[in-house]
């Protein structure tokens, strides 16, 4: 019994340690076979309709040298290599090493696959591993695209191509340059690895990782889309060529160099046909100026292209600031054709110590500077003097004029009213109430320096000790300092 077990294990070890001998090359056919053991004992000369079989692979040629001791073939003209239904290799010269299972095909080489062809000067076919690779400029030709590269591999089992070094893809809709491209025939997906640029007729896409699948694409790692008008950067970009839409996530920035504008957020949608953009998730609009950039913060922005001009709508909890003002409203529009910013629903602006509000506020932002401000319904200006003391001015309409983004004059028209508290040696001695059809306020060093009236005003001064609490405030008075956002809240969210 022990002897039987010993013999069995000896046999098993011999199988594991010494692999089975490979099958020898089988010469299936040759019109003429020349064997001369004296002149060339190391090879046979095969001529005419040569058919060689090895490793489940058929090789055809016009003529060949067969080195039987080394299990090698050197073949010439009309080379054809077939393995199953998937591989059909054509060329003019073949070097085949039967011991290694390596076939090197050169000169006018074509690999015909089910749906694509590889054209090359030289292909190396590892029959055992079922890999075909090349190290010189070659291209794959499909029905809708061509891909060329300096190096490449084709994994037969996975039906997958790997293109390396100076990869160029050309199709009807776009062209692509990259360092590495993986194309899977079964999935019909192009995977991009390394710096990649995709050129469409109207835009360029860059990424360092991504994929292209039929009409859908996704791009990661320093990705951006650029056209003649703007550039979109994001952590990841999804592009649908069918819908002509873009979805971007993470650190999304739209840079418009024509209009000196940057729109950012963590999520954005772009609709090319509708010429519309939506920014969400902590969006921020920057109207760029060399001297004083305006920052606008909101819950959502929509940007429309109308007659080649931008209309931007900011929705919900809108806040903005530059070096001189802070503003707040529920919604806002900016149309670059007339450079008008319009504030809606409880709009308010803080100018240093002054609070300015109205039902609606319009700001002329020509040349990226605040030039004029229009308050067209129930406008009021308030500045706080003490706990119960506020200087106030109101009217039917107000127009503010700015010089270099700094308020210089405010004109109040229609039923102008004002309340001013009078001081003597820092003590409040009384309050002046005044009515006038027009009031002009002149500012200097960010404070009211002079007040002018175009008609004789009606004025009443009341000593502080006789002043009733209700008379301290004009109608519609509301001190809204608790709503004032900080600059950091606006810019850094």
Predicted features and spans:
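Bacterial Sec-dependent N-terminal signal peptides
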Residues: 1-25
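N-terminal amphipathic/hydrophobic interface segments
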Residues: 20-493
């Amino acid at each position: 019994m022990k002897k039987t077990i010993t013999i069995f294990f000896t046999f098993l070890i011999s199988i594991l340690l010494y692999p089975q001998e490979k099958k020898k090359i089988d010469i299936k056919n040759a019109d003429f076979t020349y064997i001369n053991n004296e002149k060339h004992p190391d090879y046979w000369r095969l001529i005419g309709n040569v058919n060689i079989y090895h490793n489940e692979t058929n090789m055809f040629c016009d003529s060949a040298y067969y080195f039987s001791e080394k299990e090698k073939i050197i073949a010439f003209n009309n080379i054809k290599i077939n393995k199953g239904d998937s591989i059909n290799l054509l060329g003019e010269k073949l070097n085949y090493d039967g011991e290694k299972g390596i076939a090197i095909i050169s000169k006018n080489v074509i690999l015909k696959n089910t749906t694509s062809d590889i054209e090359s000067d030289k292909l190396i076919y590892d029959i055992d591993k079922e890999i075909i690779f090349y190290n010189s400029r070659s291209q794959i030709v499909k029905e809708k695209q061509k891909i060329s590269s300096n190096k490449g591999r084709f994994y037969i089992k996975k039906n997958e191509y790997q293109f390396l070094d100076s990869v160029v893809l050309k199709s009807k809709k776009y062209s692509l340059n990259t360092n590495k491209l993986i194309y899977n025939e079964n999935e019909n997906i192009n995977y991009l690895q390394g710096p990649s640029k995709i050129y469409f007729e109207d835009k360029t896409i860059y990424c360092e990782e991504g994929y292209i699948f039929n009409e859908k694409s996704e791009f990661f790692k320093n990705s951006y889309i650029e056209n003649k008008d703007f550039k979109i950067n994001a952590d990841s970009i999804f592009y649908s060529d069918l819908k002509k839409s873009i979805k971007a996530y993470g650190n999304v920035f739209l840079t418009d160099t024509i209009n000196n504008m940057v729109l950012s957020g963590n999520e954005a949608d772009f609709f090319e046909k509708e010429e519309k953009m939506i920014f969400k998730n902590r969006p921020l609009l920057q109207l760029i100026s060399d001297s004083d950039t305006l920052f606008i913060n909101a819950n959502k922005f929509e940007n429309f292209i109308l007659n080649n001009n931008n209309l931007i709508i900011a929705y919900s909890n809108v806040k903005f600031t530059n070096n001189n003002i802070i503003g707040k409203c529920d919604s806002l529009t900016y149309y670059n054709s007339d450079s008008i910013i319009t504030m809606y629903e409880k709009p308010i602006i803080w100018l240093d110590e002054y609070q300015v509000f109205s039902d609606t506020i319009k700001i002329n932002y020509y040349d990226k500077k605040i030039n004029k401000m229009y308050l067209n319904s129930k406008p009021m200006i308030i500045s706080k003097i003490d706990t119960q003391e506020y200087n106030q001015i109101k009217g039917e309409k107000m127009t503010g004029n700015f010089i270099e983004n700094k308020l210089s004059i405010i004109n109040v028209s229609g039923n102008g009213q004002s309340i001013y508290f009078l001081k003597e040696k820092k003590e409040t001695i009384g309050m002046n109430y005044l009515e006038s059809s027009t009031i002009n306020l002149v500012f200097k060093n960010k404070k009211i320096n002079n007040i002018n009236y175009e008609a004789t005003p009606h004025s009443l001064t009341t000593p502080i000790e006789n002043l009733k609490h209700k008379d301290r405030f004009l109608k519609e008075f509301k001190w809204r300092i608790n709503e004032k956002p900080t600059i950091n809240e606006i810019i850094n969210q």
